[in-house]
Swiss-Prot record:
Organism phylogeny: Eukaryota, Metazoa, Chordata, Craniata, Vertebrata
Binding site for guanidinoacetate: M38, E42, D131, L167, T168
Gene label: gamt
Record keywords: Methyltransferase, S-adenosyl-L-methionine, Transferase
Protein name: Guanidinoacetate N-methyltransferase
Entry function: Converts guanidinoacetate to creatine, using S-adenosylmethionine as the methyl donor. Important in nervous system development.
Organism of origin: Xenopus tropicalis
EC number, UniProt record: 2.1.1.2
Binding-site residues for S-adenosyl-L-methionine, renumbered to this chain: W16, M46, F65, G66, M67, A68, I69, A70, E86, C87, N88, W113, E114, D131
Amino acid sequence: MSERIFIEGESCKSAWHNATAGYDDTDTHLEILGKPVMERWETPYMHSLASVAASKGGRVLEIGFGMAIAATKLEEYNIEEHWIIECNDGVFKRLQEWATKQPHKIVPLKGLWEDVVPTLPDGHFDGILYDTYPLSEETWHTHQFNFIKGHAYRLLKPGGVLTYCNLTSWGELLKAKYNDIEKMFQETQIPQLVDAGFKSENISTTVMDLIPPEDCRYYSFKKMITPTIIKV
């Protein structure tokens, strides 16, 4: 039942930070400004992303906290520090509460990633997991590249790893244009990653079977793809 999430010219950016974080009673859905930000069925996929981001140990940067699915999994791995950027007030409050119960050092950073990330030092992270929600129709399919091209390469240590997703975009691409998830990634993501400084031979993907519920508004494809992008 995936539907078009943004109408032409729509932007939520100015209202996003203080909009209500709509966690439902069963804690299986998060909506903000009527947008379906995250759902619990994504858990196996979020765990896959977390395993990649934590694979080098050390200091991990996570951009977007959401329902803490990836964040909680990351805390199970042998990492040293876990830096998390989140801009929504309600989600950030949940992050602060969650942080007090975790085994590793948590560094919560409040704000839009566009404002926070430029303040972070070069070569600081062993792993990065980027999973934020698009805040406008204009950046629906491209916001991850704004981060990756502007900052991901410089933030990683040599040998560090980046993983990311944009399910709101990929769900639309797999509905409207592609029926092969690996071809979608190859054609729409790889060229942008190479432009950002990563080498194609250091980019790999794994695909998992995962069936979204019928009522999911943003993703209906029955496979998910996890990228592993190494800085050398």
